[in-house]
Amino acid sequence: SSDGLHFVAAPSILGPSYFRVFLYAGWHYALVMPGSVHRSVDGIADFITGPTLFEPAMRHSAVRVVGDWLEVYWTRVGGNRGRIYRSMVDLCSDWMDWSVSDPTEILRPERDWEGAAEPLAPSLRGAANELVNQLRDPCILEDDGRTFLFYASGGESGIGLAELFG
């Protein structure tokens, strides 16, 4: 896009859906749902599939490189899991040997607009067309030395924003 408003799709298909790209050590990597890693020299073509780091229940993710670590903010399907988790990946080893840390819960519905008053129910793949007790779709924004996490609240009923520290 020349103006950030109008886009023309390139003919090549980069990879599966929910393709979260990050740069590290001269390579373009992508974390895709449900948790496999792909890489490419130029980030435009020839992404090859590498290891699967996450469980099949991984839904959406957001990624951020901090030094030699990849921070992954992610959600799950199934169970009563409408929460956002954070896991870390040490990027120092060969990418085919990467592994993910155990998840740490960082956010769950706390307010009515986030679905906190709704009953706990299994999170399903696909759209949530009514208010549910779930957070989804994390997205990271770094601006002026601050880091923010956007997320869909109440399933897909609103958008929340939290500042990340540390």
Predicted regions and their residues:
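Carbohydrate-active catalytic/glycan-binding domains of CAZyme proteins
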Residues: 1-166
